[in-house]
Amino acid sequence: MGLGFEQIVADLFDRANTAGELAESYPTRGRWWGTDPDTRQAEEIDLVAGSKTTTLFMEAKWVNRPIGLDVLETLERRSTLVPTPRKRQKHYAIYAKQGFTSELVALAEKRPDLALYSFL
């Protein structure tokens, strides 16, 4: 279901973006793949969307446990590998099947650049 869930998230994003339901319009979006030059390991971000002022990095997790800080830390690290204009702000969104740990929820409440979406 992992790849199917990623497609569901992409479809939900596209619908909200087209309907003007997001804080800003994102004319470009797609999956990102690359190589970390330090580890020489392949890396992937499920969805990256760009607007005039923001790059939005999104991760979709279909797992039977709450998502924790480690997923955010990985997403933030991977976002540094994506070439983006310096003037753009970075925002992050995580979509999860089973919700989030209390630590990640508490952090998201303090960070306007982080959005969490749960399907439970």
Predicted regions and their residues:
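A cross-kingdom feature that marks ATP-driven nucleic-acid transaction machinery
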Residues: 1-120
